[in-house]
């Protein structure tokens, strides 16, 4: 694989995720025509285009939500198959959708553990889905996740998500994606519904995520801020 070069002519880090020649049709509509890109660890790659350019289609293919007609994916130089959301999750590929997919009637801690709630010891005679949730461990994990992302505007992980600001909700959705042993995180227009101050906070958070050696894909329209 040919290495990329940065602005001073030094070899850039090797690609962590490589996408080659992805094609997708919806009937007579050719949504993707040989999409190619690559992103290294500790790098933010901006996927920028107008409505209808195929950004969301490509993102959903990577997340395993859409089938595709042709194309290849490589992770750490190894060819991988992505045919379902479970495949993507097993490879460490996570997505933060624009609608965030949060449960507004649950608190922050419950949202961060949704689907992987810690259970109390001593209940092994019951199926896991019937065991009581260890709320103290769930709260501790949520606090740790929020602290790692340096979300300073959130007063309590027991706050209901429905009462949070747009920037706080975005932070919770990002924390949930990052907390699943992910190596690639896709952000679907994370600043689209935010004001100037909240946009700045989210972009600063993306910077901090980059410094944790994640591969980040920032999906944006040309009119929205996406520089890091």
Task: Indicate where each model-derived feature is located.
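Glycine-rich phosphate-binding loops of nucleotide-dependent enzymes
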Residues: 2-220, 224-225
